[in-house]
């Protein structure tokens, strides 16, 4: 007996106790009510306690002792005559009822002279306020408690039923797991069994799925083994095909098995084992049968199919196998349930045959074309019903497809089907299933999900040239395509493919922009093959850089070696790449001392090792690079010196700049009147940059604007005097002053053109210029040492020495003149700085700072001149427009 059944029995036993407890509470309540109100004692029985039957009748309201007349209910009750006192024994004194009380009528109610004895009332009814009777509140509470107990008991029974059904479903799910994990190859022919039942008006459905238990002796069944032989005959107009479906697991949702139908007519009689528990849900069967009768459309899902007898004859026992540890019991809608646990039998009356799988069964899966075929014995009247019964759990699904004919099936309510089972002692255990397949075949996937397999990918379109050969892939040109606008005229509409007269040189475009896929693949394969056999001497990062530089040479090893020996024949870019390949002293020693196979080294290391065989190879390359860059470096330095000298000359000889300084000096002294800064005779040029920071009261005009206007007016006045040859008056009108300033603004703006070299010199870094001269001197010293000391005068080095000695003489003379020019330029810059700033300390880092100041001031001056010209132009327009 299970734990749940024990709990139910305990509840059943506790319920009477609760009822008795409620009866006791009811008795106490009635006793208290009788004492409080002191009702009529005549209605009370001589005994103070009520019997059990009376209490139960009172609780259910069955004890009604009401008077036959309703007139006593509303009328006032007259007191009953008191009996004559009598002597009673002492032991009966307590049991006697007290004397009746005199009834006091209500106020405002007419008194009646009628007096009679009130009828005796039940102790359940209370006399309250005019004779109205009500059930006591304690009785209502007791009845509510009893009802609540009954409701709780019903809920517990319902929960137990639901729990038992869920547990049964879980057991069925576990029982079908071997169908999922097993394969179809493990089925045995002896596992097929046939069950015949009398057909009913409704289609036959799968009514129950029960668990097979191995410990059959523990069940309430007979230990006697019986064999059941079921013979069936199939009517001519009826054929039932049951298809088995593979169970789908959640973890392997895509592993779907196809269905196979096995006709019942080709199977022989077998034995069926009794299942320990059988449940027949008649309501579910009726609903499913109604769904089958209402649904006549062919199933759209291709996961279940029926095979004809022709197809089943082609099955072989070497195909997929299902292994199960549970048995399926198929019943009709009218199968009765047996509560006494006896064995049941299914009597076959009309020969309807069903094939069940118990244990393992082997059959061969037919091809797709054959599985799609269905044999109909009565084509005009048959219907194919979709699967309606589906045990929907997280681990298993079972679909059953039925093929029915038009022949009516006679039903009989008197007939009953029973399954008589016996436990055979020699039941062989099925073999362990093989591991499940991870991916089903592609044809099964398409069948299970009801959709055709995906089409194969389209082949890439290969472009073909004029000769019919495929065009190679070139490096792409990344651009954004423009969509054609049908409602708009575009320039691209006039361009046609045939309008391009120029024909591509296919060979040239292949050689320039084709992907060298084969070459790169060969190089990668060669690198992979030699990766394990090569020995690296140079550090990995430096080796990568050397490999990259080696590709930029565009020359083989012999050409490079000959050029290094001769001292010429290499460009500046090649010499720069070779100089960067120079190894460290340790790497040079390792390469020179390497005695192994030279092919074992990396190609870059091999190249460097060959170069090291030339005496002083890398010093040669360095002096060769120095020779190639010497003339360019000297020309750049001399040009810089020339610009510096020109800037010094311009600043010293510019009269306009001198007039500007004069105007600034006078204006500054006027601004600094009354301060320590007033009365200055000179100022540093960096004060010119501060003129734009001092603004007037209007917020627009700066001190630089004022200085420029005064200079322009002065220049314009002088120019006008030269043209008219008349002296200027001291009192000029504002209009005349504007004319003078407009004429003089052009002269002031010319200062930027006069000091053109000053702007160029401002971009020169004197420290960089000095470093360039120092590098040339160091390279010349290295060349002198190489020619005079390092290289011996032999036949191999003769050409190199002659070439370098001639260059050495030229370089020495050039460097001497370059150093003299450097000294002269620096002297001129110092003199210019002293000319404007006075004495300059020798520790001043940048002597060219004066040129930077003048350049910035010229930029401010040009901006002010443009603003002044624009303002005058706007004023002219404002004067002309009103006249129109």
Swiss-Prot record:
GO cellular component, one term: membrane
One GO biological process term: actin nucleation
UniProt biased composition (Low complexity): 300-310
Signal peptide residue numbers: 1-19
Domain of life, source organism: Eukaryota
Region of interest (Disordered), ranges: 179-204, 295-318, 403-473
Chief place of localization: membrane
The name this protein goes by in its record: Formin-like protein 9
Keyword Transmembrane helix annotated: yes
Biological classification of the source: Eukaryota, Viridiplantae, Streptophyta, Embryophyta, Tracheophyta
Places the protein is found: Membrane
Organism per entry: Oryza sativa subsp. indica (Rice)
Stretches that traverse the bilayer: 140-160
Family: Belongs to the formin-like family. Class-I subfamily.
PROSITE patterns: FH2
Family annotation (Gene3D superfamilies): Formin, FH2 domain (1.20.58.2220)
Biased composition (Pro residues): 429-443
Keyword entries, A-Z: Membrane, Signal, Transmembrane, Transmembrane helix
Pfam families, A to Z: FH2 (PF02181)
Molecular-function GO term, any one: actin filament binding
This protein's record includes keyword Signal: yes
Membrane topology classification: Single-pass membrane protein
Record-annotated FH2 domain positions: 464-884
């Amino acid at each position: 007996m299970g734990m749940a059944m024990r709990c139910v029995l305990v509840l059943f036993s506790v319920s009477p106790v609760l009822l008795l407890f409620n009866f006791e509470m009811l008795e106490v309540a009635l006793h208290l009510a009788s004492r409080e109100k002191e009702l009529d004692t005549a209605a009370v029985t001589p005994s103070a306690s009520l019997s059990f039957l009376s209490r139960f009748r009172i609780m259910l309201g069955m004890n009604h002792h009401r008077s036959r007349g309703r007139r006593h209910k509303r009328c006032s009750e007259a007191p009953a005559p008191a009996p004559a006192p009598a002597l009673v024994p002492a032991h009966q004194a307590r049991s006697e009822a007290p004397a009746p009380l005199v009834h006091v009528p209500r106020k405002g109610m007419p008194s009646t002279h009628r007096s009679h004895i009130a009828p005796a009332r039940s102790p359940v009814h209370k006399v309250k306020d005019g004779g109205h009777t009500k059930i006591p509140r304690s009785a209502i509470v007791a009845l509510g408690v009893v009802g609540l107990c009954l409701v709780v008991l019903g809920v517990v029974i319902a929960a137990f039923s639901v729990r038992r059904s869920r547990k049964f479903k879980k057991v069925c799910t576990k029982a079908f797991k071997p169908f999922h994990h097993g394969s179809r190859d493990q089925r045995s022919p002896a596992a097929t069994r046939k069950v015949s039942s009398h057909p009913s008006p409704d289609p036959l459905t799968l009514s129950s799925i029960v668990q097979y238990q191995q410990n059959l002796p523990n069940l309430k069944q007979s230990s006697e083994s019986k064999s059941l032989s079921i013979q069936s005959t199939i009517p001519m107009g009826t054929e039932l095909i049951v298809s088995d479906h593979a169970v789908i697991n959640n973890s392997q949702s895509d592993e779907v098995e196809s269905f196979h139908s096995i006709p019942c007519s080709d199977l022989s009689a077998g034995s069926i084992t009794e299942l320990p528990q059988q449940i027949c849900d008649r309501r579910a069967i009726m609903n499913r049968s109604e769904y089958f009768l209402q649904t006549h459309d062919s199933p759209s899902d291709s996961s279940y199919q029926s095979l004809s007898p022709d197809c089943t004859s082609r099955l072989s026992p070497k195909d997929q196998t299902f292994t199960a540890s549970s048995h399926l019991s198929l019943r009709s809608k009218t199968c009765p349930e047996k509560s006494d646990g006896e064995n049941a039998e299914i009597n076959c009356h009309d020969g309807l045959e069903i094939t069940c799988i118990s244990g393992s069964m082997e059959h061969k899966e037919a091809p797709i074309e054959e599985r799609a075929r269905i044999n109909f014995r009565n084509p005009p009247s048959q219907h194919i019903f979709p699967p309606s019964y589906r045990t929907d759990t997280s681990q298993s699904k079972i679909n059953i497809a039925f093929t029915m004919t038009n022949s009516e099936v006679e039903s009989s309510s008197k007939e009953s089907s029973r399954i008589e089972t016996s436990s055979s002692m020699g039941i062989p255990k099925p073999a362990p299933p093989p591991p499940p397949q991870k991916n089903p075949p592609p044809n099964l996937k398409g069948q299970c999900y009801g959709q055709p397999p995906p089409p194969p990918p389209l082949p890439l379109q290969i472009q073909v040239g004029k000769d019919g050969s495929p065009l190679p892939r070139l490096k792409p040109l990344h651009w954004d395509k423009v969509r054609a606008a049908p409602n708009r005229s575009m320039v691209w509409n006039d361009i046609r493919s045939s309008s391009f007269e120029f024909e591509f040189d296919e060979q040239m475009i292949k050689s320039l922009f084709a992907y060298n896929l084969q070459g790169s693949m060969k190089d990668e394969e060669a690198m992979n093959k030699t990766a394990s056999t090569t020995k690296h001497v140079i550090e990995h990062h430096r080796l990568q850089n050397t490999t990259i530089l080696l590709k930029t040479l565009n020359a083989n090893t012999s050409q490079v070696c000959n050029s290094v020996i001769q001292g010429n024949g290499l460009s500046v870019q090649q010499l720069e790449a070779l100089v960067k390949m120079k190894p460290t002293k340790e790497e040079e020693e390792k390469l020179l001392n390497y005695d192994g196979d030279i092919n074992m080294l990396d190609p870059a290391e091999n190249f460097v090792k060959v170069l090291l065989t030339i005496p002083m190879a890398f010093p040669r390359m360095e002096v060769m690079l120095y020779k190639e860059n010497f003339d360019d470096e000297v020309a750049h330095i001399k040009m810089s010196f020339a610009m510096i000298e020109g800037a010094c000359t311009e600043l010293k000889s510019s009269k306009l700049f001198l007039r500007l300084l004069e105007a600034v000096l006078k204006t500054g002294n006027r601004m600094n009147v009354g301060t320590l800064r007033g009365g200055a005779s000179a100022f540093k040029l960096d004060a010119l940059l501060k003129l734009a920071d001092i603004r007037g009261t209007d917020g627009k005009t700066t001190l630089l604007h004022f200085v420029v206007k005064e200079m322009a007016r002065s220049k314009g006045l002088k120019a006008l005097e030269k043209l008219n040859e008349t002296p200027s008056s001291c009192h000029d009108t504002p209009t005349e002053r504007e004319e003078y300033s407009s004429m003089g603004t052009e002269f002031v703006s010319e200062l930027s053109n006069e000091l053109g070299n000053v702007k160029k010199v401002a971009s020169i870094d004197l420290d960089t210029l000095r470093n360039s001269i120092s590098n040339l001197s160091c390279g010349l010293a290295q060349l002198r040492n190489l020619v005079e000391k390092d290289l011996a005068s032999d036949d191999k080095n003769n050409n190199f020495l002659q070439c370098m000695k001639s260059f050495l003489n030229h370089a020495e003379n050039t460097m001497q003149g370059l150093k003299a020019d450097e000294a002269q330029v620096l002297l001129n810059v110092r003199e210019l700085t002293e000319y404007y700033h006075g004495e300059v300390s020798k520790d001043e880092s940048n002597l060219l700072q004066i040129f930077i100041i003048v350049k910035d001031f010229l930029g401010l001056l040009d901006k002010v001149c443009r603003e002044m010209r624009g303002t005058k132009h706007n004023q002219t327009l404002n004067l002309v427009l009103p006249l129109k």
